[in-house]
Swiss-Prot record:
Residues 116-144, 145-167 form the IQ domain. It comes from Arabidopsis thaliana. This is Protein IQ-DOMAIN 23. The gene is IQD23. It holds the Pfam family IQ. Residues 257-267 have a biased composition (Basic and acidic residues). Keywords: Calmodulin-binding, Cell membrane, Cytoplasm, Cytoskeleton, Membrane, Nucleus, Repeat.
Length: 403
């Protein structure tokens, strides 16, 4: 009895000691579990309170909460492992319901740990979702800001381009208006010059042909000058007119005969024919009575030169460089003066110079005339007066005025 009593008593004591140890251990576990339960509650409360704080602070708080949960889970795992070790070491001695109670406690602690882990994961997922939503909102705001900036830049570029196009169109219109004004002014200028100078409106070809025609007329006039002078000499001789001859002839030299001219050298003959003369050294022949006046045809070098000069000097200069009326009247008076053909019985063969101007003499072609020919004298010969008159008419010269 005593042995069995001690045995059972020791067993009871050992059971009591084991139960006291288990209680202590379970109290530790309960404390750790309570602390783990309280920590998530505190963390959840802190998360709810700090929703308005910055994201960095929230992240730090969540990291601290997860660290606390991990520490609690680690302590719970250590406690469970120690309980399992103790129960496995005393398994041969414990035959009653003590082992079942310890297993039940371990299952409860594992369930709690799993629930705590699930709660922590939910908290983390919720916080991560919050951060993702916030980042998405920030990204959307950034995209909107970029769109606004780009739209402002595009609108500014479009306005600048439109302003440049308007400036270009305005410049083009101004250039067109200036060109139209210049063309209108040039047309008005040409019309005014055509009114002032009719020859300027004709083409250069017509002007050239006109100059050539004037030259031909002047050459024809030179050819027929001798015959006209013969007729005028005969008519003046037949009329009852008294001619007065100026006796002042200091520089007069009679024309040599044809034989003498043939003996002269060509150079000397050219110098004698082309010598300049003026009113001072030219003979003056006049009449006291009324003289027979023949119309003067100004188809000479002066008209030819005036027509050609009019081609070059009219219509190609501005209005302020055009010839005035007084200048044109002066040129007209100098180029085509009123001439009176004066014939004397003497064989002078010269015309009077007008207004003291110098001019050159050109002899009539003597080869086309034959002094002794019967056709020239009208058949037969003639008396000495008629011979002298024909010879003087033959040797007359016509002048070309220098304008």
């Amino acid at each position: 009895m005593g042995f069995f009593g001690r045995l059972f008593g020791s067993k009871k004591k050992s059971d009591k000691a084991a139960s006291s140890r288990d209680k202590r251990r379970w109290s530790f576990t309960t404390r750790s579990s309570n602390s783990s339960k309280r920590a998530p509650a505190v963390t959840s409360a802190s998360v709810v309170e700090q929703n308005g704080l910055d994201a960095d602070k929230h992240a730090i708080a969540v990291a601290a909460a997860t660290a606390a949960v991990a520490e609690a889970a680690l302590t719970a795992a250590h406690a469970a492992a120690e309980v399992v070790r103790l129960t496995s070491g005393n398994g041969g001695r414990n035959v009653g319901g003590g082992g079942n109670s310890s297993v039940f406690q371990i299952g409860r602690s594992n369930r709690r740990w799993a629930q705590e882990n699930i709660a922590a994961m939910k908290i983390q997922s919720a916080f991560r979702g919050y951060l993702a939503r916030r980042a998405l909102r920030a990204l959307k705001a950034l995209v909107k800001l970029q769109a606004l900036v780009r739209g402002h830049i595009v609108r500014k570029q479009t306005a600048d381009m439109l302003r440049r196009m308007q400036t270009l169109v305005r410049l083009q219109s101004q250039a067109r208006a200036r060109a139209s004004r210049s063309s209108h002014s040039s047309a008005s200028f040409h019309s005014s010059t055509a009114l002032l100078f009719p020859s300027s409106s004709s083409s250069p070809r017509s002007l050239h042909t006109r100059c050539v025609s004037n030259a031909e007329v002047s050459s024809l006039d030179h050819r027929g000058g001798s015959k006209r002078l013969d007729w005028q000499a005969e008519e003046s001789e037949n009329g009852d007119k008294i001619l007065e001859v100026d006796t002042w002839k200091p520089h007069y030299h009679p024309k040599p005969l044809r034989s003498e001219r043939n003996n002269e050298s060509p150079r000397k003959r050219q110098q004698s024919l082309l010598g300049p003369r003026s009113t001072e050294n030219s003979p003056q022949v006049g009449s006291s009575g009324s003289r027979r006046r023949t119309p003067f045809t100004p188809t000479s070098r002066s008209e030819y030169s005036w027509g050609c000069n009019n081609y070059y000097y009219s219509g190609y200069h501005p209005n302020y460089m055009a010839n005035t009326e007084s200048y044109k009247a002066k040129v007209r008076s100098q180029s085509a003066p009123k001439q009176r053909v004066e014939v004397s019985n003497e064989t002078s063969g010269y015309k009077r110079s007008v207004q003291g101007q110098y001019y050159y003499y050109t002899a009539v072609e003597e080869e086309s005339l034959d002094v002794g020919s019967a056709g020239y004298y009208g058949g037969g010969g003639g008396d000495s007066d008629r011979l002298n008159r024909n010879q003087s008419a033959k040797s007359r010269m016509h002048s070309s005025f220098l304008v």
